[in-house]
Every structure is written in C-alpha cells, then in structure tokens.
Amino acid sequence: MHLYNEWLPPPVAEETKKEKESFARVVRCVKELHRPDDPESVYATLKWISVIELFVRAKSELSVEDVSELVEIGLQIFHSSENKLYAQVRWGNVLVRLINKFRKKLSLKVQWRPLYDTLIHAHFSRSPGPEGWRLRQRHFMAVTSLIRSCRRFFPQGAASEIWSEFMSLLENPWHNSSFEGSGFVRLFLPTNPENQDFFSEKWIKNVLELWDSIPNCQFWNSQWTSVLARVIKNCSFIDWESYLPMLFSRFLNMFEVPVANGSGSYPFSVDVPRNTRFLFSNRTTTPSKSIAQSIVYFLKPGSSAHEQLEKLVNLLEQYYHPSNGGRWTYSLERFLLHLVIAFQKRLQREQQDPDSLPATCLGKPERVAFVGVVLKLIDRGQYSKNEHLSETVAAATSMLSYVEPSLVLPFVASRFHLALETTTATHQLKTAMMSVAFAGRSILQSSMSTAKSQDLGGDVDDRMFLDLIGISLSNALLGMDANDPPKTLATMQLIGSIFSNMAVLDDSSDDLSFMTMASFSEWLDEFLCRLIALLQHLEPNSVINEGLSSSATSGTFLVEDGPYYYCMLEILLGRLSGSLYNQALKKISKFVQTNILPGAIAEVGLLCCACVHSTPEEAVAQIVEPMLLAVISSLKEIPVNGYGGKGSAETLVSNKQDKQTLSPALEAAIDYQLKVLSVAITYGGSSLLPYKGLLIEAISSAFNSSSWKVNGAGDHLLRSLLGSLILYYPIDQYKCLSRHPAAPALEEWISTKASSKDEQVAHSRWHVPTQEETQFANELLDLHLQSALDDLLSICQSNIHSDAGDEKTHLKVTLLRIDSTLQGVLSCLPDFRPSPRHDMVEDLQFFIAGASGSCVGSAEIREKTAITIHAACKYLLEKKSDDSILLILIIRIMDALGNYGSLEYDEWSNHRQAWKLESAAIVEPPANFITEFNSKGKRRPRWALIDKAYMHNTWRSSQSSYHLFRTDGNFSPPEPLTFLVDDLLTLCLHNYETVRVLAGKSLIKLLKRWPQLLSKCVLSLTENLRKPDVQEYVVLGSCAILSSHSVLKHLTTDPKSFSSFLLGILSSSHHESMKSQKAIIELFVKYNIHFAGLSRNILRSLESHVEGSTSGDLVSQIGSMSFDSSSLHWRYNLMANRVLLLLVMSSRIDPSFSLKILDETAGHFLKNLKSQLPQTRILAISALNILLKESPHKMQGKDQPSVSSQETENANSSLDLALSQIFREEGFFKETFESLSHIHITDTDSSSRGNHGSSSFQSMADKSITRFYFEFSASWPRTPSWISLLGSDIFYPSFARIFKRLAQECGVPVLLALKSPLEEFCNAKERPKQCVAAEALAGVLHSDVNGLFNEWDSWIMVQLQNVILGQSVESIPEWAACIRYAVTGKGKQGTKIPVMRQQILDCIVAPLPPTATTTVVAKRYAFLSAALIELSPPKMPVTEVKLHIVLLDELICNMSHSSAQIREAIGVILSVLCSNIRLRMSYQQEYPTEEGKTDVDSQLKEENWFKLISAKASEAVKNIQQASISDSLDTSTDVDMGNAQSNGDSLDDVKWMETLFHFIISSFKSGRASYLLDVIAGFLYPVMSLQETSHKDLSILAKAAFELLKWRVFPESHLQKVIGVILSSADDSNWRIRSSTLTYLRTFMYRHTFILTHEDKQKIWKTVEKLLVDSQVEVREHAAAVLAGLMKGGDEDFAADFRDRSYAEANSIQKRRNRRKSSSTQSIAGVHGAVLGLVASVLSVPYDMPSWLPEHVTLLARFAGEPTPIKSTVTKAVAEFRRTHADTWNIQKDSFTEDQLEILADTSSSSSYFA
C-alpha cells in the first residue's frame, strides 16, 4: 500500500481496502461497453476515463491483472476509433498514465505500426478531418506520449523495421522530409532489451554520418543527440572509446556561446519548417539534457571520457561566471543540472542492482573525479545574477554533498565565510544561506554520524562544519529584516531546514555542541525578540480591502511569497523540549496580549496556530483563553443590531432607539483579535471544549454587532471553529518519532518507497472527532444554520422590516451566517440524496474512499437549506436585484450546497502550488555515501510526508463522490438541485458582471457533475441568442456558459442541442452592441478551435429529413444563409459558410452520406471564389482544397493498373458535372482571377509565406474561421528556402493547389477555359494579377492530367517563354515560385518526378537570344536556381545529370560577369549544382545500380570543375594582391599600356573572386557545405587573405565568408589540409594576413580541440609563439590574446611548459636590465614578446589564483618602466588583472607577499584596492 494511503485517517484508511474490488468492477463495465464491431461504442466508454484516472491519482492498490486487461482494451479502443480524435486523446492520455505507473509490472507486446499509422493519418496526410487545431494539438501530444510509453514494449526486430522505414526519408538532407524522418526516428526507435542487438558499430557510423549532413541546425542536433543518449544509456555493451573525441567535439559546438569576441549564435541556422518544429519537440535551444546524460553514461573506470569531460568543462566554465551571462546561460544552467541529476540516478541504479558488473560501475575514484570537475562549474555559477542558475547551483551542491562530502563541504564552508566578509554584494549572502540550507543535512550527518565510514581527516574538520552551522544560525538572526524580503525568507528556510534534521532541541543534550557561542535557550530568546520586532515593523501589502474578499490571511511577504515562515515556526515549536517550549510560549503569549497589529493578522495568527498545533492544551490555556476574554469584553461595549441569532424579535426592537456608531480604532482591534483567534484555533480540537460557552458567546456577539467588519470576522471564527472540531487533520506532525540509527541526535527521514525492513515506520496520528466535539458542532449548526434559515424565511415571506436599510442589513447577516456554517462543515454535511429512476432502490456505487471529517447534520438539512435559499433568491431578484453583496452571498451558498466537495478541491489545488516541497533542503537522495545507507527512493522529513498525506486526504474527500452520477444513468438529479440550477441560470444572466461570473463558475461545476441537466441549459441559452430584443448582458452571460468545455463536448453527441446551438449563433446578427458581437464571435471561434467532429446520431438526424423530421433541414437552412445574396452581415455569411464546410467534412466520414450534398457544396464554394466578400473568398479556397480530390483525369503511372473506362466515368461524373457547369459560364475564370488578385497584398515588410499573406486585413478571429489547421501541415515549399536573391514573394500555394485539383477533377476543359484569362493576366501590369496567373499556371503544370502535353505544345510553352523574356522585374519572385511549384517532386520524399519537369527545365535552360538585357539574364538565373533546389539528387535520372554538366560548363565560363546581381546568382547556382552532384555520387557509391554505370558518372568522377576552379583561384589571389601592391606603389602619372592591361585583368579577377565568395557563402547558408568541405578547405587562403583590399565589395564578401567559416567544424579527413593553409599563411609576408590567420585560429582551436592530434597542436602552438616576436606590434598583441585563449582551453601540458619558458625568458631579461642600467642590445620586439608571454599567462586565468600567478604578475609589473609599446601593455594587463580579481580580492591577496603587493601598488594608479 502506498505510504500516503497507509497514513490516511483511520476511518478512511479502512475504506480504501475496497478499492481493488471497485477497480475490477470498472474494468468489467468498460469491457461490456466496448463492442469492437460498433465504432460508436467508443463514446459510451469515455465517461469511465475520469474514474480510471481517479484510481491512478488516488495511488490505490490495484491488481496487475486488471490493469493489464484494461490497457489491452484501451489500446483496442484507441486503434478502433480512427476518426474520433477526441476519444483518442482521452484514451491515449489515460493509457499513458497507466503504462507509466505500472511499467515494471506489465508484460505487453505493442506493435509500432498501428501507432505510426494513426499519427500519419491524423497529422501528416493531405486530407485531414474538420477537427479544430486545439484538438489536433492535444491529439498529437497524446499520441506521441503514448508512443514514448509503449516504446519499451515493442517486440523484437521492431528497431530494424523502424530504422529501415525512416531511412528512406533521410536520403536527401535538403528536403523537409528528412526533418520529419529524424523526428520519427527519435520518437519510435526502441532501446529495450529485446531490440538491443540492432545497435552495432555500423549503425553508429551511419548515424554520425547522417548527423553531419545538416550542420548548424539545433532541431536536427537535438533529434540525433536524444537518440544517441538513449542508446548510450541502455546499451552498455557498446564500446564508445573511438567515438569520444568526435562526440565531445559535437557536444561542445552545440552550445552556442561567443568564442573570441564572435557572435553567440549560428549566423545561418538551417530553417526547419514550422509544422515540423511544432509537432516534434520544438525546443530550439541546445539539447543540454541529452548531452549531460550521454556524458554521465560514458564514464567508466579506465575510459578517457573523464579527461574529455574535464576539457569540456574548462572551455565552458568561463560562460558560467556572473559577468559573462547571455542567451546561453539557460542552456548551460540546464546542462549543469542534468549532469548532476543523471549522475545521481546512475549511482542509485548501481546501488540497487548489486549484480551489475564492477567493470562498468563508478567506483570511489570516478566519483571523486566527477565531483571535482562539476565543482568548477558550481564555483563559477554560484553567485550568478541569473535566479535559475544560482538556485540550480545550490541544488547541485546539495546533491553532490551526499556523494563526496570531503570535497563539497569545505567548498560550501569557504564560500559562506567569503560571503559574510563581502560588504558590497548583499545578494551573495542570500545565495550562501541557501547553499548552507540545502547542504545542511549532509553537513550534520558527516559530522555527527557515529559510523565514521570515511574519515574527514581528524577532529578539526568536524568542528569546522559544526561551527559553520552555528555561525550560519547566529547570522540568521541578523538576517530577519522587514525591509529585505528575499534575505528574510532565505534565513527562515535555513532555520527550518536545519531544525528538520534535529531530533529534539534542548540545552542539556551534548550532541548539539554546535551552539558554541551561547546556550540554546539564549538563541531562542534572541530569535523570538527578532521575530517580534520583525512582526511589529511589517508593512501590509495593500490597504486591507473591505467586503467579503478580504480573507483572514491576506498577508505580507512572509505569507505570500512562500511557505518558509509558517514551516519554520511549526518545526521550531514542534521540536523544542518541554522546558524550552514553555519559555517560548510565555514570551509569545505576552506579545500577543500586549500588541494589536492589524497589518500582520495572518503572521501573528500563524504564530499562535503553530503553538497550538505543537501542544494544544497548554497553548489554548495561555494564548486562546486570554484573547477570547479580551474580545468578549470589548464586544460587550459596542452597539448591536441583534441579528446574530440570540434573543427574540421583541428585544431587537427595543435595542434600536439610539444608532451610535463604532469608533474605527475599536472596530479594527476587535477585527484583529477575532481574526487572529480564528487562525489560532485551526488545530485546537478537543482542547477547545472547556471554552465552549465563551466561543459561542463571542461568535453570537460578533454577528449581533452593527459593524459589517466585525460580522465578517465572526464569520471567520465560526468557520475555523467548525473545522477545528469535525475535520480530520494530523496532530504531532512536527514531533520527531524515530531517530537516525547512525547519529542519534538527528531525525531519521523516511522514503515513500519503503522496503520491507523499514516497515515499522511510525504512523501519523490524526485528529478524529470525539462525540463531544460532534455534539458541539451540531449545536453550532442549530444556532447558525437552522435558526438563520428560519429568519431568512420570515424576512422573505412576512415583511418584518419597515426600513429597507434594516432589511438589507438583516439579510446580509443572516446569509453570512448560513454561508459561514456551510463553508465550515465542508463536505461533512451529507450530500443530497439522488432520486433513482424507475423506482428501483439501488445502492450508490463506490469508487474511492475519502472523507474530510466525521459526519454532522443530515442530508435533510442540506435539502431544507436549498429550498429556503431558492425562495430567498426569488425574493431577492424581485426586490433587491441591484444589491450585489447579497447576490454574491447567495451564490456562494448555492455553490457550497450544490457542488459537494468542491471547497476541498479548491483548498487542495491552492495548497498544491503553495508548497515548494521538492526543495533540495528537505530531500535526502537515495544513494547516500555519508552514512552508507541507501533506500529505494528519496527520503524526506516525516512532517513533509504527513503534509502530503494530509493533502492527499483532502483531495480524496473532494473526489470520493464526484463521479458517482456522471457514469450512472439510473439516478436523476434530486429536486432541490434542479431548483438551484434554475436559480443559477437566471443569475448568470444578471446585469452585474461579478454576479454573472460567479454564478457562471458555479453553474458550470454543477453541470459537469450532473451532465443530465446540460441539454435543458443549452436550449434555454441558445434561445437567448435568437430572441430579437435581449439585453447585452444576457448575451454575454449566455456566451460565457456556452463556451465552456462541458457544453462544447455535449454538442458532439446531442442532435437537438447541436442544431439549436448552430442556428442560435447564425441567427444572432441582430444584436447591435460591440460587446455582444465580440462575445458571439469568440464563442464561434472557440467552437471551431475545439470542434471534435460529429457522432453518428447527429449525422443521422441531419439526413433524416426524408422522413419529414424538423432538424433535417439544418443543412438547407444554413446553405441558404451562406449565399452573397442574403442580406446578412459579411461575418455571418462567413460563419454560415464555415458551418456548412464543417458539416460536409464531418459527414464525409460516414459512408452512407449522400454524395449529392458534397457536389452541391463543392459547387457552392467554387462560385464563392468570385464572391464580393474577401473573407468568404479565403474560406472558399480552404474549402476547395479540402473538397476536391485527386481523380480519374490524372495520367496513369507505369506502376498503377489502368482503370477500365466505364468505371472512371461513373466514379466521379457527378462532381465533374456539377463543377463544369459552373466554370463553363462565360468569363467565370476571368472574374475569379479578378477577385482573387484582390487578396494578394504586396506588403514589403511581411516576409511570412504561405499563411495567405492576408495578415494586413484579417483579425485573429477571422483567421481562425477562414483557415484550417491543414494549411499548416501539408505546407509547400517542401525544401528549405534560403536563396535571398529571389526576394519575398506573395505566391500562395493553396491557390495553386485549387487549380491543380480542378484540372485533375475535370480534365482538359479546365485547361481550355483557363487559356484566355491566363494570357490576359500574364501580361497585366499589376503585380497581384501576374501573381494569380503564376499560381494558376503552376497548378496546371503540376497537375499531370491527360492532354497536358498537347496544351503545352499549343500555348503553355509560349506563355512561359514570354514570361522569361518579359522585361518586368517586380514579379520575378512570383514567377520563380511558380516554376519551383511546377517542378516540385511528388510523394512524401519528393522523389516522384512530375510529368512536365523535363519540358519546363528545357524551356528555362534554352540559351537566350544574344540581345537579351541583364535583367532577363538575371531572371533566367533566378528561375534556374529556384528549379534546381527542388530536384532530388540521390535519384536523379540521367537526363537531369546531363543538364547539370551542361550548366556547370556554362556557369564556370561566366564567373567574371560584369553585373554584380548575376555574379551572385551564378555563385548560388554553382553551390546547388556542385552539392547536388556530390550527393548523387555519394549515394551511388552506397547503393550502386546496374544501369547506373553510364558515361555520365565517369564524367562526374573526374570533377573537372573542381580542378578548374582551384587552379583559377590561386592564380586570381596572386593577381589581386600584386595589383593592390602595384596600386599603392603606382603613384606616377605616366601609366604604360601593359600596366593598364594587367589592371583590366585584375578587375576580372576581382569579379571572379566575388563569384567564388558567393559560392562559399551560399554553401554555408544552405547547409550544403557538408558535401563540399574539401572544396571549401581549399579556398580558406583566399578568404583569409582578401579581408583588407582596396576593392570594398570584395572585402565585404570575404569578411562574410570568414564569419561563416569560423562556425564550421571540419572532419578529421580535411583537417590536415586546413592546418597546412593556416601554418603557411601565418608566415605570409603581409601582416594583415598574419593577423587574420590568428583571428581564425582562436575559433578554429576552440571548435576542434577534441579532434586535433597532439602533433598538430604542437605545430600550432609553435607558430603562435613565433608570432609573439613579430615585427608588427598589432600581430604581437593579437598573438598574446590568442595564446591566453589557448591556455584556457584545456591542454595543460602545453600551457605549463609555455608558462615556465616565458617566465624564465622574462626573468633573464629583467636581470640583465638590472645589471646594466643602459638600454640593452635586445630589440624592442624581443622584450615586448617576452612581456606579452607573461601577459598571456596572467590573462589566461581571469578568476582564479593558482600558485604560480603572484610571481608572474609581480614580474610583469616590474616592466612598467620600459619604453612605449611595452609600458602600455603592462599597465593594461595589470588593470585587467585587477578588474577580474576584484570580487574575491579579500581572500586572494593572502597568496601575495608584502613586497609583491608593493610592486603591484606602484604600477596601479589607484591603490585603494590593494589596501
């Protein structure tokens, strides 16, 4: 049994034993309801889902057989309800919960294919259903999480099936299907034991290759990282050693951090289509979790993973420092957190699985090493300004301190002392407090544990840690400050968490020796003084608001900002020993009696409450009794109304003569005392019985008072008293019952997953009401509920008040008393008894146990109250309908009456958010290496678990009877309840908004619980929308209720409500006011978003008009509304069209639906294309896209069997006829084109494509009506758009698709009808018109219908040629998009070739006439690039390959074209051509085909283009450089002819180079560079050397290419080539080139640090060192900066060697200087180089103080007297050193000697830092 259920109050715990039985009954019911032959039976099973969830959430003990049976049925139901997304969502979610909870006990086999089919059918197919996008989103989430849960049950061989299924999607990395493929692989690939044999070396190589094919794309990275992380974790047999350098290199480069002043994010990340990002987990940040998990599972004894991790941490640690925050902080913070969590989980797994191999387990040395590395990150991030990071650091410290206390605790201690010493940064103290609080338990355990399993090194350390706690507690006293909330809360958390560890707080015990400075009682005194001072100085948050809403506890930050205050008090007072408790109680009692603090009601109340909770008898005597007496004596002196229930009507009248008022001060005082009392007695229980008379008197006199404020306080007191008497709540919660076996001074903490040997966990004690208490409660009910009800009736029936004001007051007080008692007894007053149908008396079902207290009163009382309230409500609505306070009171009473259990539910949900119970301060991890004491789960203090059990009980009591009537149709709602519903229906249409909202909430809750009442409500509310003269507020109220989920769900199954709802909305256009229109539209949009299809019985009722029923004419009614001609407002016309579409789409699923309606609606929407209303046109486009299907006129491919002719004619003739009649009308298409061109808005700024671009004139609501989710899943283009020279187009693929479908539907007639309008519009002047023509042409060309060839030859080809040769420029983007659409490959992977592709390509490639202008040339190139992107390289037919070869030759000849625009186009096309060829070649090598060995392939293999370009490049660079040198020399005027000649050449070279740079840039931008790396590596030198030339454009391009190069990681195969280029250009004669080589080196080394070999690194170090003594100053300084970076980056041996050498060198120079004062013979460069070597060493450790640093800095400072370049270098470096070490200077200066400090002080201008 789960611990929480074991610890429930005894009466409830007894009941829970029946739950196993009742679950079995539920499973049987579901089984009976589900009939596999009838798919509609799914709807009947849905009502049981919430009941099944109940059992899961109640943590009941269920039998595994039942669960597995239910899961099997559930999966069947899930697969059989194919088109019912809503049912799949509900079943999917409940299955996920069941499978995850029982995953270790179930033995299922789940097939993956049906799940995949569901996913494809609902989200990746071209013809989706009508469901709203919110529902689709939920469906996607449900299906994917179901797949994740079922992965572990996939049978053997599933992995290889899945892999081969999705491999085909990954063939072409430049097609969007590859993103989908990676998403599917991540989602489906199982790593369960059955499938582990699939993961081989070959598979890993394959994955790494695939991963490399798309660079710089976080989506892609996160998919593959996640797959690998799972494999690494679960398949421990794979040896990863050889892949580590490569993987770590990947990991490092996935963190987008700024390297060497670069930017912190990818310059061009590859664009992932929106829907893929939306569907597959779309975190575009670094996949930190998977990286961390992989690294932790790499660690093994003897593996090199640890060194790699250390290197990674060395490179990343600087970005954790507070001064280096940025966008990357989030992913780094996650990385740290997941490293620690994964490490902890792995340790726990190894602890609990004793037979795991020692070879793979983490031993002591591995643990120490790991903790040591992570501490570096913790050290950097501890005082981060980023909230999350500093909290994560504290939590990580806490977890690691249980693993390796000897490393972590000294660190915590030193950090705490450091924070105490700094006076400037106060936020540090808060963080330091937090880390001590979080590590408190491990500090105490390691110092007090008697089993000293590992020695911390003598007593000194033990004392040190205990002192640390002592110091932190004494500092905590200073931390309580009313002006600094964060610090105050941190100190309270600290005190609470440390005392949670102690068994008892007492002076006499020796164990608490950490209170060195004073005895504990002194500390306690001081603490209470501070606390009282704090309470006296609190400022209340707001003016205490009058009226009902001011609860007793609207507190200040102590109560509002977290539970620490109350928690700390409870723990402290619960753990004190008897004598100390009395000492504290005296002090508190004195404080409470002498102070009145209306600003701190809640705080003082909680203080008293904690005292009472700890030992009720004494506290009640010392605190409650004096306060009660004081209040009663004050209450006697104030004026009364006497409506409070005591005394008869005569005395009332006599009291009334003098109306004196109450002084505000006295009123506030009484209010304060009553409210504090009400909080204080919350846990009083039976110890309140002696004061029964006093309490009754206090409450009655409070209600009798004439002040409303005092009445309200009386209400609090009554509520609290009732609760304290009859509810179940834990007592002794904070006492310590079991001590820790290893350290008796500490409390033992408990895990909820108790193993068998800890069974004797002490139960919690509950307050179970005694007979006297229930008797007292019943008396209170008589006094304040029964008598108040009689009063209420008498006021409403016999007018007893002549004065309206008196009547109002009396009503207010009477209602308040009723409300107060109902709120107090919660669900202890029995619920209404439902009336069974058919006179059968049957017992109520039982689902789960739960009660919040023992029963008082009877169901009759509830019924009587309801009937009285019904009468009162009627009276109020007649007489006092404008009095909102009375109405609100009455609604609250109705809520408490009707929604049985909802008050408990509210309390539970508020509490759930309030407690930060997961805080690391009170969690002890399962694997604890301090006490060598491991448990199955996390351990927590007993009080925290009791708190959870208490909340669990509250939740159970709210749910125990909630679902009884939802599943059982045998009961009809009791009569009083129907009264309440009628009243609430009237109230929720009230003209005051507050009243409407409250009544609405209450009504919706009631309807949820009694679904039988729904249809009545829906009918009456939709009637309100239809009536002509209804007030605005009635419309608003109706819409609010109608848009609730229960109503929307009800509409899918109930035909009558459905038709009344739709007609109600559509015929509500007569409401004038803006507000009501807005409400109606919002309701309609919400209906659309959540639309869940229609059930069969609604569709039947729609069709049944044949038999002459009424609702059948719904379709025709709506149809008549949706024509332009009807005089409706355009938005209603739009809504009618939308409803028509939804009906037709829903009905397509039903096979018996008549096709006639389908044809009619398709025709209707086709006509709407030329409608006058723009919105309706847009909707028509969506509709046609959905209704038109592919059809008989499409050409038959080779593989499809041809259909016999007469079949085709019958198959679709009806739709064909219906449509062709319409478009054969004269001028139909011309009009349509006209009206469509108006939708195209050429707004330059919006580059949003595909979303109808109609952003400018569509509001959000209209968008949701006109658009379908569908637009977003089958989106075009299917390849990434990265070519910027195409510009942004306004080409809408959905328009093109209509024309394509029309052509496929009706064949050649469409082509003929389109001919003349197309010819007219292609030559139009306006861009929108050309755009429509482009869309129509694209659709026709892509349609593949029979007879297209003839039309192509007769007129289409001519049209296309005209477009190419046309002079107009502005519509190029649209025509490029048209061509791109027309050649797009078909099928999911875009590999099926459209029939017309070859013809279109030939038409574009055909050479232009020699007279063509540059615009035409540029246009042709733009079209070419658009078309080439769409080709699918792996499977190109030979004709397309030949085309590539021809084009390559043409372009290489044109590379130095005179126009810049054309040069760019050539560069872009070259990158596409070359990468396409490369990809095809690599594909042919892997999967060679027989006919593939043609002459074409051998031509490709030679790669002539590569040789040509490379040769030309090196030559061009030389020429450009010489030219620029001769330019600078050539100042003479007489230029001879030869020179001019060479100048012209060099200009050609410049143009040629520009094209080459365009080629490089576009390869990077498009992500195609992976296939061209060897080519690009060859062009590294030109890019580096042409950064600074006299040709401005060239240099700009070179710089752009350079920025992109910095981000590229080269694989090992090309590294040698790159290093060769780097080394040679570092020796270049031009110093600018040397400098840019250094710039490149910094990032190059960072990106490749894991994969460079030792020799390569040595060469690079040597080269950089040589540049330290370069002749040019800039280069020298640059080299020093690079060296500092290299030294940070991990290669310790190189760094140490260099440091020693540079120190020796500088030292010898300094000594020589000292020997002879004269200037030395050494060159300035030499000395400067030596100094810079020192500078590099000093700057390489910006925040630490290693042992060698002081000497280096001092030596550096001695050079301050040198001549100019050296002097400034020294001063800058010392200043920088001082800046970065300023934070911790107080401690770090101890590592310097006095002399060294003096020398430093001389160099520094301001010596104040170095005091």
UniProtKB/Swiss-Prot annotation:
InterPro entries: ARM-like, ARM-type_fold, Blm10_mid, PSME4, PSME4_C. It comes from the Eukaryota. The keyword Ribosomal protein does not apply. GO terms for cellular component: proteasome complex. Residues 1626-1711 are annotated as: Bromodomain-like (BRDL). HEAT repeats lie at residues 563-599, 1156-1193, 1442-1479, 1613-1650, 1655-1692, 1746-1783. GO terms for biological process: DNA repair. The bromodomain-like (BRDL) region specifically recognizes and binds acetylated histones. Belongs to the BLM10 family. This is Proteasome activator subunit 4.
